[in-house]
Design a protein with these regions (language model features):
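Intrinsically disordered, low-complexity segments enriched in small/polar residues
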Residues: 1, 16-19, 39, 65, ...
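Negatively charged, low-complexity tracts enriched in Asp/Glu with abundant Ser/Thr
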Residues: 1-24
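A generic structural micro-environment signature
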Residues: 7, 24, 29-31, 66, ...
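Short, intrinsically disordered low-complexity segments
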Residues: 10, 42, 83-84
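Short linear sequence motifs
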Residues: 11-14, 29, 34, 60-64, ...
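Terminal alpha-helical segments
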Residues: 16-21, 27, 57, 76-80
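A short, structured beta-strand/loop element
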Residues: 23-57
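Mixed-charge, Lys/Arg-enriched low-complexity segments
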Residues: 46-86
Length: 86
């Protein structure tokens, strides 16, 4: 599994990792939503602050689709960051 999902009231949160970075994503769980917005944050280590990853607007029909899209955006962001360092 790429990430683990937990529920906090109306908010769903997923935590995952890629190349030593922590990925945190969140979306809303409310009935009647036509699209599921996703927010994505990445942190390199526990001592670093989280950085918000800009996620393009996209029609996401389910929380799984939202988290998969958010995870894909985060891994692309991390890989681009790692590439600039080399």
């Amino acid at each position: 599994m790429k990430y683990e999902v937990s529920t906090h009231g109306h908010r769903l949160e997923a935590i995952g990792a890629h190349s030593g970075h922590r990925i945190r994503m969140s979306t809303l769980s409310a009935q009647g939503l036509e699209t599921w917005p996703v927010s994505v944050y990445v942190r390199g280590s526990e001592s670093e602050a989280e950085v918000k990853v800009d996620v393009p607007r996209h029609h996401l029909a389910s929380p799984t689709e939202a988290f998969d899209f958010g995870y894909q955006c985060a891994t692309l962001w991390i890989d681009a960051l790692d590439h600039r360092r080399t």
